[in-house]
């Protein structure tokens, strides 16, 4: 008698992400007093839509990379502090790799691949930073495997590293993510952050890792019935005016949640 695999159903609630800014009375007076002659200032003042939309998009990317690197999404902004746990097994997060030049990196990676296989998964990609890739390329054990005993000290090019991974572990896709974004601190100064940590490696067995689920925000719903164009509308821009103080507000809104198709792999 046959049996069906256990059916797993996951329910997620998408998070509303908003960013807004206003054209103050002072800005509007400057514009009406002839600032419009300076194209750079005009772009600075009236590029609010793109800037706010980019801010929402960046926040979704931060959320995705947070989940990809930790199995959790951490929120600590606008007086809201919470953690969304995606249920990644603790044993999948317990590896502390030694990436020094003399370390047995290949043995450590083989242990990860073997554990994934024991759980029924085949790793097909490693996601990391260029800093980690450079450490792999300067590891003596990896250099010896590629160039022989006389090749220690020879830097390993990325294509040779991918070839070695493909031969030993069955996957040759090593994706690096080193983009950065800026946030504004309470004192008005800016801080630069990485989307993906520079000292981590994420091994995946499903091709959909790093994706997210978009939904219809309240602002988008206010525009009317869902239609064909709505299918390609992820971030909604709205504008409105306030009488006192006189200001024009621009707001970008998106409804989004990162998705892990299979937290175990």
Question: Residues of each region from the PLM?
Answer:
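Short, glycine/acidic-rich hinge or "gate" loops at secondary-structure transitions
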Residues: 61-78
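Assembly/oligomerization interface modules of large self-assembling protein complexes
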Residues: 1-31
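Sequence/fold signature of self-assembling virion shell proteins
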Residues: 143, 147-265
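RNA-binding accessory domains that recognize and position tRNA/RNA substrates
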Residues: 52
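Active-site-proximal, glycine-rich beta->alpha crossover segments in alpha/beta enzymes
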Residues: 25-47
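Extended, solvent-exposed, turn-rich assembly/linker loops in the middle of proteins
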Residues: 81-157, 164
